[in-house]
């Protein structure tokens, strides 16, 4: 901000009478009409907290029922009226999540190698190409 010069003002006399101290309730409400601004963390703080949380835990990240519907939908293309044991669907989900976690780790390394912190589709493509999954 640009600095501005202060102009001299004529005083109107002696000291003004002292005001009474405000009550605690009046002091706590802000001067902007009593609407308190909600607390917000800085960008990236919550993301880092989530990363640490999910790295510590071992539970499945994808919800079970949507994954089961996806498995059944894909299986319909190969054979109709297929039945799945619940353990088979859980095994598929474990394998799928392990694969995705590994892929995202490699993708992140590709992004870091390109001096970026944001992963992009080209990072996933490069990671898969290096792995030999996609020519």
From Swiss-Prot:
The record marks 5, 36-37 as: Not N6-acetylated. Residues 1-40 are annotated as: Disordered. Core component of nucleosome. Nucleosomes wrap and compact DNA into chromatin, limiting DNA accessibility to the cellular machineries which require DNA as a template. Histones thereby play a central role in transcription regulation, DNA repair, DNA replication and chromosomal stability. DNA accessibility is regulated via a complex set of post-translational modifications of histones, also called histone code, and nucleosome remodeling. The keyword DNA-binding applies. The modification Phosphothreonine is found at residue 12. The gene is ch3-I. The modification N6-methyllysine is found at residues 5, 10, 28, 36-37. Signal peptide: none annotated. It comes from Chlamydomonas reinhardtii. The lineage of its organism: Eukaryota, Viridiplantae, Chlorophyta, core chlorophytes, Chlorophyceae. Keywords: Acetylation, Chromosome, DNA-binding, Methylation, Nucleosome core, Nucleus, Phosphoprotein. This is Histone H3 type 1.
């Amino acid at each position: 901000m640009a600095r501005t010069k202060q102009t001299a003002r004529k005083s109107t006399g002696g000291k003004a009478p002292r005001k009474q101290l405000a009550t605690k309730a009046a002091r706590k409400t802000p001067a902007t009409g009593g609407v308190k601004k909600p607390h917000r963390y800085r960008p990236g703080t919550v993301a880092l907290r989530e990363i640490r949380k999910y790295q510590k835990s071992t539970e499945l990240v994808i919800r079970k029922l949507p994954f089961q519907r996806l498995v059944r939908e894909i299986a319909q293309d190969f054979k109709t009226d297929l039945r799945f044991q619940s353990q088979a669907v859980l095994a598929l989900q474990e394998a799928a999540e392990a694969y995705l976690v590994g892929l995202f780790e490699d993708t992140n390394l590709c992004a870091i190698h390109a001096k970026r912190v944001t992963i992009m589709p080209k990072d996933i493509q490069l990671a898969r190409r290096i792995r030999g999954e996609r020519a």
